[in-house]
Structures are given as structure tokens and as C-alpha cells.
Amino acid sequence: LTTSSAASDVYKRQIWWCQGYSEPGSGSDLASLSTKAVEEGDQYIVNGQKVWTSNADKADKIFCLVRTGPQEPKHEGISFLLIDMDQPGVTTRPIKLISGKSPFCETFFDDAKAPQKDLVGGLNKGWTVAKRLLEHERTMISAMGLTGGGDGSEKTKSGLAEIGKKYAGTDSDQKISDKAFRKKVTLHDLNSRAFGLTMQRVGEETKVGSPSPAAAMAKYYGTEHNKLRYELMLEAMGTSALGWEGEGFSMEELAITRDWLRTKANSIEGGTSEVQL
């Protein structure tokens, strides 16, 4: 942000932002991005495309990685630019996901304009800013390993243990009757508790402005752990997890199935699992 008034508007929720990082040809190799910004007078002219832009169709502004030094090494020719979404040169197109939701968008820049004062961190210094933000993003995404939910924002009404008892049955002690499956659920719960303590430490470091190097590992483990949670739910539910819509399935069953489908992207978005290792 370039002014204190802009920061104040964010805190008051008067301005909604989206993030313009990934491009159709630049995902894991983000620094190969090709969206360019050319200086023209006291502004930049932006052309290119971003993809997987969360809530771009609802955002007022986008903080965007753009190439301003085409002759520089790829990491050194990137700038961090703030761009108004409400202008003729910016269009968005929602992407419908397999879960049925459309939180992501394609974002197109066709001679979009941004004032030079909205360049953050200095010309060709955007990669440093972006890396810092990615540390926070990965910490945030990793939290789905604790909360569940296919997109990290919604929880199913019942947890893994409750789903296991409901669909796999219980013994006289009200424990999951299938001992092998019960062991899987118990191990998942123990790992959740251990991961929670780790996330507390990472969170404390983040609060003081020092994102931990553990953010990458937390993102890796949290997303893989969340995917496993839903795999175990479906293992317990059996054919009850095969519904998409219509009669014969409860709302919770349909929600779990859709969330399970959504979790397949957890280990891709925000940096693939392979990139974190």
C-alpha cells in the first residue's frame, strides 16, 4: 500500500483486494511470468493475463506481479504493482471448479493503467515483496490441515471421528467398530494435534513479522493432511459419498463429496507440494 488512507480503507473493509501472481504458463515457475508493465509518462501500461485469481470478479484492486525489466534475469525483472480493477482495460472471467463453486477467475489486462506511485518496493524489486507475502499465504493455507473444509473456509458439520462412527458403525464402547479403520482415524487425530502445536509456533513468529522457514513445510503437511481427512471420510461413507445432487443423499453427504473433490487442488494452490520440499 502506498498511503496510510489506503491502508485505513483496507482495515475498514472498504477496499477488497485480489492477488495477481499465477499465469497460464507460469505456475510453479512463477518468476517466468510474462504480464508486462511499460512506463508511459507518470503511469504504467499493463498487458497480459493472470489465472486462479481468487475473487477477482468482486475485488476493487489487485496487487500484481508484472515484468518491468525484460532484459534482466527473470527474478530481477519483476515489479509489484497495484492496479484498479474497475477500469476499461481489466476484465475477469470466473472459473467453475469441479466442486461446483467459482471462487477463482481469469484476469485479463489490455492496456490497463496504474500510476507510478502504486509501484511497491521499487522498480524490478517485486520478487522480494512477493516471496514475503507467499510465506504468509502458505501459513494461512496450511491451517486447513486443522480446520478441514475443501477450500479452508468451510467445515463439514461432523468431524472425521463422527463420520467414522456414523457410517462404519460403533462397538459397545461407542468406538468405531472396524479396528483397522479406527487406527487410521486415531493416527490422523494425533497428527492433527501435533500439527496444531507446530502451527502455534509458526503463528507466533508470523505475528512479530518474521514468517518462519517452516511455512513451506506447514503448507505441504497441512494440505496433504486435509486431503487425507477427506479420503478417510469417503472410505467410511462408501456409496453414500457417490452423490452429486438430487434425492438419496443428505446435504452433509453432498457437501463432503464436493469438499473432497475440492481438496484435490489443496496441494497445488499457493505453491505445489513438490515446490515446498
Describe these PLM feature segments:
Residues 90-197, 266:
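Glycine-rich beta->alpha junctions and the first turn(s) of the following alpha-helix
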Residues 26, 51-56, 98-99, 265-270:
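Glycine-rich phosphate/pyrophosphate-binding beta-alpha loops
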Residues 13-21:
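A short, Trp-centered hydrophobic/proline-enriched beta-strand micro-motif
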Residues 127-146, 237-277:
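Glycine-rich phosphate/cofactor-binding loops in nucleotide/flavin-utilizing enzymes
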Residues 43, 47-93:
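A short core secondary-structure module
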Residues 172, 193-248:
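C-terminal helix-coil-helix/basic helical segment that borders enzyme active sites and/or dimer interfaces
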